[in-house]
Amino acid sequence: MITEFIDGLQQFHFLQNALITAIAIGIVAGAVGCFIILRGMSLMGDAISHAVLPGVALSFILGINFFIGAIVFGLLASILITYIKSNSIIKSDTAIGITFSSFLALGVILIGVAKSSTDLFHILFGNILAVQDQDMWMTIGVGVTVLLVICLLFRPLLLTSFDPVLAQSMGVRVKIYHYLLMVLLTLVSVTAMQSVGTILIVAMLITPAATAYLYANSLWSMMLLSSSLGALASILGLFIGYSLNIAVGSCIVLTSAVFFLISFFIAPKQRKNKHALSSH
């Protein structure tokens, strides 16, 4: 199977595009996912990934680039969730659940209204083997931009992630960095939609980062390990999906889940935690 996969990479341009795109998404999703994990915003990541669906559908209806619609609706969902949480007795998880389910339902309706040739299944679950050259370069461009922003603003992002109260007292505008992270999350969600679809995007964001969290002792090392695991899961998932002729996006997610499952039992932090629990 490995030989066939390598031969396919040498012969088929679409497979080369798929591999490069998958690696790029794995790297950038792994990096952004670390901040999502540290901020306890896994549900927010799920909401944003679902919220881009109506934006994509509306973009098809209006004949504009789907990046524009997806980013607008991703930010709209973020603002709506924050507003509901800040101006009512409703807790954040409830606000997130209401918002993401509503946006997902709206997206399905808009796709039906658009009557486009775009397959709903591919939007929901991805089709990385259909990635074109322009999609690949756009993914790389977005990935480089997101990573550059993280590097340039690493310190305030780190501070607002670990201790927002301290950051506020130091004059850091916490809300601005919160919404900046939402922008980065939306960008990653839009690019990852091509590989795993809107349904499974959150797994690309959360699972490699959660696995890295079991090993890392600093945010930098966590980001590096998470991105590496994301890229490795993407490569192996593409190999398995292509070789067995099954859904590549799902293979990527399941490969990442296997990494986490193994780490859950062997990671040093986990062993220490189990030892501490057993001693009580």
From Swiss-Prot:
Gene Ontology CC terms: ATP-binding cassette (ABC) transporter complex
Q: Which membrane topology term applies here?
A: Multi-pass membrane protein
Q: Which UniProt keywords apply?
A: Cell membrane, Membrane, Transmembrane, Transmembrane helix, Transport
A single Gene Ontology biological process assigned to it is:
transmembrane transport
Q: What's the domain of life for this entry?
A: Bacteria
Mainly localized where? membrane
Where found in the cell?
Cell membrane
Asked whether the UniProt record includes Transmembrane among its keywords, one would answer yes
List membrane-spanning regions: 18-38, 61-81, 94-114, 139-159, 174-194, 196-216, 222-242, 246-266
Record bears the keyword Plastid = no
Name residues in a coiled coil. Answer: none
Q: What function does this protein fulfil? A: Part of an ABC transporter complex involved in manganese import.
* Similarity section: Belongs to the ABC-3 integral membrane protein family.
Protein name stated in the entry: Manganese import system permease protein ScaB
Organism listed in the record:
Streptococcus parasanguinis
